[in-house]
C-alpha cells in the first residue's frame, strides 16, 4: 500500500490528458486524431493511474470529462490490467473504493462499472477490500453510499453472478450468503432505487440458484408479492421479470402459488406503464412453453383474452406509426436497411424457420408480445378460446369509423395469430374469413392493408388445401391477385408486407402458380422498377421463392423475357463492393437451379463475376486499399452458393466454365478459410462439383480430401456442425466418383463418422443421415479397407440407415452395406437383427440390382443359420418388420 500511496500525477501530464478528454467529449472534434493521441498515452505504464485519479479526485474538472476518464479506464483495464505493475494495480483498486458513494450520480455509476470490470479480472480473492468497502457503504445509512454499493453489486451480479457464490480464503462466508439477507431487507426500503437494485440483483440468481437464494425462497416470494403494487414502474417490471424467469427455470417453486401469481400477472398485463405490461405479457408464453398443466390457466382465459386483444392495438407512441404513411417516393435512409443474414448452403434436412413477423420494424413491444401470447394460447387451448375471442373480434371489426382503425387492425392481427392453433374450428368458415379479408386489402389505412396481407399469408397453407373444394380455386385466385395488387401499393410498408405474404403463398402453392406465371412475373417486375433498396431485398426473395416453387416451368422464353433483362441490368450496375448484390446473388442462385440447362445462356458472365467477387475479397483481406473495399466474407459465401446453384442447374454443362477458370485453387483456399460459414459454402460447392465435373478437382484431389476429412474430427464437429455436415456429404459424393482414389483418407474419415453415429441425442439429424450415407459409400468403393472394422459401427450404422427416406443416396449406402456383408459375412452376423431392421426400413427399393443384392444377403444368412437360428432371429423383431422382410423372399 505504501508504494501505491507514493504515486502522484505530474501536473503537465494531467493537463494534457484533461485537454484530450475535453476534446474527446466535444461533438465537433476530430475523433480519429484524438483516438491516436489516446493510444499514444496508453503506452505509458502509469496512464491508468492518471485516469483513475481524474475519475476519483478530479475536483474542478467537468463531470463529463471525469466520466470519460472512467470509461476509458474501464476499456484499458480489460486489455491491460494483468500486465500493469503491481503498484499501479493496487493504486487503481484503492482509488476506486472511496468513490463508491460519490455525491454525483454519474460518477457513482461510472465507478460501479469500472469496479465490475475489474472484479471480473481479479475475482473475490484478488480484491477482498472491495467487499469490506461494499459492506461499510450498505451499513452507512447514507443514500449515496448505499446506492453506489448496490449499483456496483448489481453490475457484478449481472456480469458474473456465479463468482459471488464461491468459498474464498480469508472470508468466513461466501459473499452471496452475506449479501442475500441485506438485499432482501432492501425490498422494504423507502427509496425506490434501492428496491429496484436489490430486486435486480436477486433476479440474476434465479437461473444459477445458489443455496443462499434457495434457502431464502419463501422470503423472496413474499417480497415479490409485496412489491407487485410498488409505486415505481421499474420495480413492478422487475417483479414481473422474476415471475417469468421462475416459471421458465423453476416452475416447481411457483406451483403452490400459481393461482395468486397468475392473478397478479393478469393485473400487471393491464399496467398503465407499457414496459411493465410487456414484461407481464411474457408470462403467458412462458407458462405454456414449460408445459405447466393448462387447466391452471383455463379459468383466466375469459379475462386474459380481452386483455391481450386490447394490447394488440397500436399505441399512440408506437414508432411503427411514424413511418406507416411513408410513400414510395420517400427515399430509403441507410438506417432503414435492416442487417441481413445469408444462410450458408446446407446439404441434408431442411431446417428453415418461418418468419411470422407482422411488422416491418423488428422492435419487440407489447403489441407483438400480446399477439405471440394469443398464438401460443391458441396452440394450447385450440378452438376453446374461440367463444371468448370471436365476439370481441367481430365487435372490433364492426367499428367502421376512422377513429377505430387501430382496433380493426388489431382484430385482423388476432385472426392471423390464431391461424395455426384454432384452424379446426376456423376451417369450415375459411371462405367467409377470406371473403371478409379481401376487401380490407383496399382499406384506406395502410397498416390495415399491410396486416391483412400478413393474416392472409398465415392461412396460405389451408387456402391451398381447399383448392379442390367448391369455389376453392376462385378463392385462391382472389387472394393471389389481391396480394399482387398490394405488391404494387404506393405505401412502402404495404409493399413489404404484400411481398412477404406473397412469398409465403408461393411456398405453399408451388406448381399451382404455373397457370398464373405470366401475371405474377409482370406484377413482380413492375414492382422491381419502382421499389427502393429495402423492399427490393424482399422482392428478390419473392422472385427466388417463385423459382424454387415452379422450377423448370420458368424456363420459357416468354417468361425469361419478362424477368431476366431487368435483373441482368441491375447485376451490371452494382459494383463488386455493393451489399445490394447479396440478395441478387441469392435470387440468381434459385433461378439458376430452377432453369437448369436453360440458364446456360446467362451462365458465363455470372460465373466469372462470382470468381471475381471471391478474388477481390481475398485481396481485400490482405490489402483493402488495393482491392478498393473492406473485406466482407458474405460476398464470398453468396458467390460460392451461386456457383453451387450453377453446378446444380447446369450439371455437366458447367464443365467448360470450370476448366477455363482458377476455381479449383480458389475453392481449396475457401475450404481452409477460418470463417465457418465460408468453409460451409465451399464444402457444399466441392460436393456439387464432385457430382458434375470431378475430373477438374483431380490435380488437387488429395488436398481437398484431407481438408474435408479434417472438418470431421470431434472438435470441429462440436464447433461447426454445419461445416462437418457439408464436409461429410462432399466426401461421400467424391467417393462414388473417384472410387479407390479415396482410399488414403478412408480410415481417417470412418474413425470420425463412427462417434457421430454412436452419439446419443443432440447431434444434428442431417449430420447423422449424411454420416450414414457417406459411410455406406466408402464401404461400397473400399470394402476391403472398411470390413475389418465393421464390428465397431455396424449396429449404430444400421439404426441410422433406418431413419433415411427412400432415395438414391440411401441406395448407395445399402450397396455399401451389402459389400460389407459380402466381404465378411461371419463378422456381420452379430448385427443381423439390426441389418434386418435396416432392410425393412425401405418402402420400396426401386433399383432391381440392389433389391436382388439385399435378397441374396438375407437368404444367405437364412441358410447359414438354419431354420432354428433364423426363427430365433425373427422372434426378436417386431411383427411389422418381419412382415416387410417377406418382400425379400425370406
Curated annotation (Swiss-Prot):
Cellular component annotations (GO), alphabetically ordered: cytoplasm; nucleoplasm
InterPro entries, sorted: ARM-like, ARM-type_fold, HEAT, Importin-beta_N, Importin_beta
Single GO BP term: protein import into nucleus
Record domain Importin N-terminal: where: 34-102
SUPFAM superfamilies on file: ARM repeat
Keywords assigned by UniProt, alphabetized: Cytoplasm, Nucleus, Protein transport, Repeat, Transport
Protein origin, superkingdom: Eukaryota
Described purpose of this protein according to its UniProt entry: Functions in nuclear protein import as nuclear transport receptor. Serves as receptor for nuclear localization signals (NLS) in cargo substrates. Is thought to mediate docking of the importin/substrate complex to the nuclear pore complex (NPC) through binding to nucleoporin and the complex is subsequently translocated through the pore by an energy requiring, Ran-dependent mechanism. At the nucleoplasmic side of the NPC, Ran binds to the importin, the importin/substrate complex dissociates and importin is re-exported from the nucleus to the cytoplasm where GTP hydrolysis releases Ran.
Region (Disordered), start-end ranges: 316-336
UniProt feature, compositional bias: Acidic residues: 316-329
Protein name: Transportin-1
Placement of HEAT repeats on the sequence: 13-39, 44-82, 91-124, 130-167, 177-207, 220-247, 259-286, 302-380, 388-419, 431-458, 476-509, 517-550, 558-596, 604-652, 663-694, 702-739, 747-783, 791-824, 833-865
Main location: cytoplasm
Subcellular location: Cytoplasm; Nucleus, Nucleoplasm
GO MF assignments: small GTPase binding
Amino acid at each position: 500500500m505504501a508504494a501505491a500511496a507514493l504515486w502522484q500525477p505530474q501536473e503537465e501530464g494531467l493537463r494534457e490528458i484533461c485537454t484530450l478528454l475535453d476534446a474527446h467529449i466535444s461533438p465537433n472534434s476530430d475523433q480519429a486524431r484524438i483516438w491516436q493521441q489516446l493510444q499514444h498515452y496508453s503506452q505509458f505504464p502509469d496512464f491508468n493511474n492518471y485516469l483513475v485519479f481524474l475519475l476519483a479526485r478530479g475536483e474542478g474538472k467537468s463531470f463529463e470529462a471525469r466520466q470519460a476518464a472512467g470509461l476509458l479506464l474501464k476499456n484499458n483495464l480489460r486489455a491491460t490490467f494483468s500486465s500493469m505493475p503491481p503498484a499501479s494495480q493496487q493504486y487503481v483498486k484503492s482509488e476506486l473504493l472511496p468513490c463508491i458513494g460519490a455525491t454525483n450520480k454519474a460518477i457513482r455509476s461510472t465507478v460501479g462499472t469500472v469496479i465490475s470490470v475489474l472484479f471480473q479480472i481479479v475475482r473475490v480473492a484478488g480484491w477482498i477490500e472491495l467487499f469490506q468497502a461494499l459492506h461499510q457503504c450498505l451499513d452507512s445509512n447514507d443514500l449515496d453510499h448505499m446506492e453506489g454499493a448496490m449499483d456496483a453489486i448489481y453490475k457484478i451480479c449481472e456480469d458474473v453472478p456465479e463468482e459471488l457464490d464461491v468459498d474464498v480464503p480469508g472470508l468466513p462466508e461466501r459473499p452471496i450468503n452475506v449479501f442475500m439477507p441485506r438485499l432482501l431487507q432492501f425490498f422494504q426500503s423507502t427509496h425506490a432505487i434501492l428496491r429496484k437494485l436489490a430486486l435486480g440483483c436477486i433476479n440474476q440468481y434465479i437461473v444459477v440458484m445458489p443455496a443462499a437464494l434457495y434457502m431464502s425462497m419463501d422470503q423472496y416470494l413474499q417480497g415479490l408479492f409485496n412489491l407487485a403494487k410498488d409505486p415505481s414502474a421499474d420495480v413492478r417490471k422487475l417483479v414481473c421479470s422474476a415471475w417469468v424467469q421462475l416459471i421458465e427455470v423453476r416452475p416447481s417453486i411457483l406451483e403452490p402459488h400459481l393461482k395468486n401469481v397468475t392473478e397478479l400477472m393478469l393485473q400487471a398485463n393491464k399496467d398503465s406503464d407499457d414496459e411493465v405490461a410487456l414484461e407481464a405479457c411474457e408470462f403467458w408464453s412462458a407458462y405454456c412453453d414449460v408445459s405447466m398443466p393448462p387447466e391452471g390457466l383455463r379459468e383466466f382465459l375469459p379475462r386474459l383474452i380481452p386483455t391481450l386483444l386490447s394490447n394488440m392495438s397500436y399505441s399512440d407512441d408506437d414508432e411503427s406509426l411514424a413511418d406507416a404513411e411513408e410513400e414510395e417516393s420517400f427515399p430509403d435512409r441507410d438506417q432503414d436497411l435492416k442487417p441481413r443474414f445469408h444462410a450458408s448452403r446446407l446439404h441434408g434436412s431442411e431446417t428453415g424457420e418461418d418468419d411470422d413477423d407482422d411488422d416491418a420494424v423488428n422492435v419487440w413491444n407489447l403489441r407483438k408480445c400480446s399477439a405471440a401470447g394469443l398464438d401460443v394460447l391458441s396452440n394450447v387451448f385450440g378452438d376453446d378460446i374461440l367463444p371468448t375471442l370471436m365476439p370481441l373480434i367481430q365487435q372490433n371489426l364492426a367499428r367502421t369509423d376512422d377513429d377505430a382503425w387501430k382496433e380493426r387492425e388489431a382484430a385482423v392481427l388476432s385472426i392471423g395469430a390464431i391461424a395455426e392453433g384454432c384452424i379446426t374450428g376456423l376451417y369450415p368458415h375459411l371462405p367467409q374469413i377470406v371473403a371478409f379479408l379481401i376487401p380490407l386489402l383496399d382499406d384506406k389505412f395502410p397498416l390495415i392493408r399491410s396486416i391483412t396481407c400478413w393474416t392472409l399469408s398465415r392461412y396460405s397453407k389451408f387456402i391451398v388445401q381447399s383448392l379442390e373444394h367448391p369455389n376453392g380455386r376462385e378463392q385462391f385466385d382472389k387472394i393471389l391477385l389481391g396480394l399482387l395488387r398490394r405488391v404494387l401499393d404506393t405505401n412502402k410498408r404495404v409493399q413489404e408486407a404484400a411481398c412477404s405474404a406473397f412469398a409465403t403463398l408461393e411456398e405453399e402453392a408451388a406448381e399451382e402458380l404455373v397457370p398464373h406465371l405470366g401475371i405474377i412475373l409482370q406484377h413482380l417486375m413492375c414492382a422491381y422498377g419502382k421499389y427502393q433498396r429495402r423492399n427490393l431485398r424482399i422482392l428478390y426473395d419473392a422472385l427466388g421463392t417463385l423459382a424454387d416453387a415452379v422450377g423448370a416451368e420458368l424456363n420459357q422464353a416468354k417468361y425469361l423475357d419478362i424477368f431476366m433483362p431487368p435483373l441482368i441490368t441491375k447485376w451490371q450496375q452494382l459494383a463488386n463492393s455493393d451489399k445490394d448484390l447479396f440478395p441478387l446473388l441469392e435470387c440468381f442462385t434459385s433461378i439458376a437451379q430452377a432453369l437448369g440447362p436453360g440458364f446456360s445462356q446467362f451462365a458465363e458472365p455470372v460465373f466469372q463475376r462470382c470468381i471475381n467477387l471471391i478474388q477481390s475479397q481475398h485481396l481485400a483481406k490482405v490489402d483493402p486499399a488495393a482491392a478498393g473495399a473492406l473485406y466482407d466474407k458474405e460476398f464470398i459465401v453468396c458467390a460460392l452458393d451461386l456457383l453451387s446453384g450453377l453446378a446444380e442447374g447446369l450439371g455437366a454443362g458447367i464443365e467448360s466454365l470450370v476448366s477455363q477458370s482458377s476455381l479449383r485453387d480458389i475453392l481449396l483456399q475457401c475450404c481452409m478459410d477460418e470463417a465457418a460459414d465460408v468453409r460451409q459454402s465451399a464444402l457444399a460447392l466441392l460436393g456439387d462439383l464432385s457430382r458434375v465435373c470431378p475430373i477438374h478437382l483431380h490435380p488437387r484431389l488429395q488436398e481437398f480430401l484431407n481438408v474435408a476429412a479434417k472438418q470431421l474430427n470431434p472438435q470441429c464437429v462440436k464447433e461447426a456442425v454445419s461445416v462437418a455436415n457439408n464436409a461429410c456429404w462432399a466426401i461421400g459424393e467424391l467417393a462414388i466418383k473417384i472410387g479407390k482414389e479415396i482410399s488414403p483418407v478412408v480410415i481417417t474419415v470412418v474413425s470420425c463418422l463412427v462417434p457421430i453415429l454412436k452419439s446419443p441425442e443432440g447431434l444434428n439429424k442431417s449430420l447423422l443421415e449424411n454420416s450414414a450415407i457417406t459411410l455406406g459409400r466408402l464401404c461400397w468403393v473400399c470394402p476391403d479397407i472398411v470390413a475389418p472394422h465393421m464390428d465397431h459401427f455396424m449396429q449404430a450404422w444400421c439404426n441410422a440407415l433406418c431413419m433415411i427416406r427412400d432415395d438414391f443416396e440411401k441406395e448407395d449406402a445399402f450397396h455399401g452395406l451389402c459389400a460389407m456383408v459380402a466381404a465378411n459375412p461371419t463378422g456381420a452376423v452379430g448385427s443381423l437383427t439390426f441389418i434386418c431392421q435396416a432392410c425393412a426400413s425401405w418402402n420400396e427399393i426401386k433399383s432391381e440390382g440392389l433389391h436382388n443384392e439385399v435378397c441374396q444377403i438375407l437368404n444367405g444368412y437364412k441358410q447359414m443359420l438354419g431354420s432354428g437360428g433364423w426363427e430365433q432371429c425373427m422372434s426378436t423383431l417386431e411383427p411389422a418388420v418381419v412382415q416387410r422382410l417377406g418382400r425379400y423372399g425370406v
